[in-house]
Amino acid sequence: MSAAPTDAKSVKLVVVGDGAVGKTCLLICYTTNEFPKDYVPTVFDNYMAPMTVDGEPINLGLWDTAGQEDYEQLRPLSYPNTDLFLLCFSVISRTSFNNISSKWLPEIKHYEPKCKMMVVGTKTDCRNDEAMIRKLADENQKPITTEEGEKLAKDIKAICYMECSALTRSGLNQVFDEAIHIVLNKNQSSKKSSKKCALL
């Protein structure tokens, strides 16, 4: 990352979703290239750094939020002036998937009615984890598919759907690259179907 001049455009991305879906891991892995060994709810400090995207200087701000109900009064304090919300769910948690439309969409729309959103499926490495698949099967469940994620994004009028794994870093950089480009209007993903923007 290179130093950005004072007139650089600011890009504010806010990550929301249920607790334990991997929001903090996403941010830590993206900014440090290291996967945290232990789960500690919301330990990531807001990350601000100058960088250059396609030759254009920007100041990138990444905001983590706590998904737990205990933080419902504090969480909205991070919402004002957000350029793009990343609504995250775990592909191995049907509850977190359902809560995107039943909880997180209404919450951010209440505070930021004209907000832009993208939907992000996390923990995609678990789709191939036999032990996890058996555990879900015991509960009469199965991992959320890419197609389900795409449909969710379309149903809630999100700009696009993408998915990634913080553990393997598969798709991780692409999620944030896409988010930054959406804010900077460098691509036309908002004019395409969510399927065009989905990352397999």
UniProtKB/Swiss-Prot annotation:
Motif Switch 1, residue numbers: 33-44
Cysteine methyl ester sites (modified residues): C197
Comment, domains: The switch 1 and switch 2 motifs undergo large conformational changes during GTP/GDP cycle and play important roles in the interaction with downstream effectors.
Alphabetic keyword roster: Cell membrane, Cytoplasm, Cytoskeleton, GTP-binding, Hydrolase, Lipoprotein, Magnesium, Membrane, Metal-binding, Methylation, Nucleotide-binding, Prenylation
Gene Ontology terms: cellular component: cell projection; cytoplasmic vesicle; cytoskeleton; plasma membrane
Keyword Endoplasmic reticulum found: no
Keyword Lipoprotein: yes
Binding site for Mg(2+): T24, T42
Name of protein: Rho-related protein racD
Propeptide cleavage-removed residue intervals: 198-200
Membrane topology of this protein: Lipid-anchor
Source organism of this protein record: Entamoeba histolytica (strain ATCC 30459 / HM-1:IMSS / ABRM)
One MF annotation (Gene Ontology) recorded for this entry: protein kinase binding
GO terms of biological process kind: actin filament organization; cortical cytoskeleton organization; establishment or maintenance of cell polarity; mitotic cytokinesis; regulation of actin cytoskeleton organization; regulation of cell shape; signal transduction; small GTPase-mediated signal transduction
Family under the similarity heading: Belongs to the small GTPase superfamily. Rho family.
Lineage: Eukaryota, Amoebozoa, Evosea, Archamoebae, Mastigamoebida
Cofactor(s) required for function per UniProt: Mg(2+)
